[in-house]
Amino acid sequence: MKILVVDDSKAMRAIVKRALSTLDRVAGATIIEAVDGKEALGVIEAESPDLVLSDWNMPEMTGIELLQALNEAGSAPTFGFVTSESTPEMHELAKTHGARFLVSKPFTPESLDQALAGAL
């Protein structure tokens, strides 16, 4: 399994990677990174990840813009948000565009694992 973590915060990418490393569900997964949606598009094309975990608000291209671009290209991998943005409207928008989950920051490895259980 290959997982792409997309976040403009290097520290947050490290936190997500650390949480993933504790989960049996994704044991042995290769974890790759991108700093925003624009970079993620290239990484997705080159690496074909099985799962994308994206922040919502990022420079260049937001997480929802990334998901929309993937949908338009017909190549959206399993996609979920790990973000501090968590309004009911954002949950609905994420769901409408095919995101499998939205985990709010701060999160625990257990809450991430529960979200992944419904997506993988």
Give each language-model segment a name.
Residues 8, 105:
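A Lys-centered signature of the CheY-like receiver
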Residues 10-32:
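Two-component/phosphorelay signaling modules centered on CheY-like receiver
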Residues 33-42, 63:
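Helix N-cap/capping motif at the beta->alpha junctions
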Residues 42, 64-75:
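Short amphipathic alpha-helix used as the core "switch/output" element in two-component signaling
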Residues 55, 83:
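Active-site residues of response regulator receiver
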Residues 58:
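Receiver (REC) domain active-site loop signature in two-component systems and cognate sites
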Residues 65, 86-101:
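Alpha4 helix (beta4-alpha4-beta5 surface) of REC/receiver domains from two-component response regulators
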Residues 107-116:
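C-terminal output helix
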